[in-house]
């Protein structure tokens, strides 16, 4: 009881301080002529729908514990509208077709102690799911040609891609982002950098201050490495900021803010998604991406991902400092880890209902259901609390963007960044880097060339990477 009183007192104090601070800022800040670039400007919130998408999950075709048909069915049961099967090194050829490779099936069958089964949907069940049988006609569709690239990476340098067959059966990938993202770009696909906290090892830090500390040579390298990739390849839409149950991505919102500061001044945005990365059924439902579209089609999914007209949503937060901020704003102690295990819809996650940008008044409003608080972030810092932000009140704290987070009993929602053009806007400070993964890629190509040149080497290699079709 005493703890609750203290928290409520702290919340009230914070509200008073922020109100007082805002009045000072409003007096001191300049009236800047902002051009607000709204990623939701083309969305008709009154007539369009938002479609719940899982852009990253696995099946027994690679290292998932769940058979293909069961994974699809679980997503359908939990109300997903869009699903991408993104097995390691295996391009999904559709829900009624087996897609795998011999090396995966052999290795994982040995690990399982039995032959690994891959069961696609029947044509009848496929038609039922895509037409919404049992869901009042609300079907679930597939994102075409999903795959998680770099399947044999030794340091989790993983990249998701869709809408291209590139990567099917391609091995390797340790530290190598540039080659795979370049090839996805050149073959007309889209990509995203998956759970960067695994590759960067930021997930192992004990506090946010140490994660992605640019004074650390390793973090400085990977930050600028990612920034250069995003600048060079616009088909790489951004990064995964909250996946699975957030244990490995808990500091990747900080990375996102750093990348936004570096990349936006070059003329492009960096979008953020949330995914399940489900290998087991208990991960389904932990996160998703709400796609704003007039109709649920593969063409609209692609356009939505390219335009950034979507919201990332998760039921998990493992960043204690973020939760401390939400505790102050709501007067509720959320502890150091937030986990909303409810899956029946009785505790809904925050849902955006409208985004309103007023260029004349330099204001942005996020209308959202099922949220206890909304706050606005600029350059990685919370600068305002409430559904509406007046940019002129915070002009001395704003750089090249603002973004919003909405939090409630059901989880957290992240908007995309609203990029800002104005006189005196920050300039880019991206350092030129070399992707040392390219050296490892060349070494991989050399080893494959040598191995396939010896007697029976090519036959063995071709067999291992041969597609499994049944």
Q: Residues of each region from the PLM?
A:
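Sec-dependent signal peptide cleavage junction
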Residues: 19-33
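A metal-dependent hydrolase metal-coordination microenvironment
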Residues: 32-210, 234, 240-256, 270, ...
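Sec-dependent N-terminal signal peptides
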Residues: 6-17
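N-terminal secretory signal peptides that target proteins for export/translocation
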Residues: 1-4
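Short, solvent-exposed mixed-charge patches
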Residues: 468-470
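Structural recognition of alpha->loop->beta junctions
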Residues: 210-247, 293-300
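C-terminal functional module detector
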Residues: 29-33, 37-46, 71, 266-272, ...
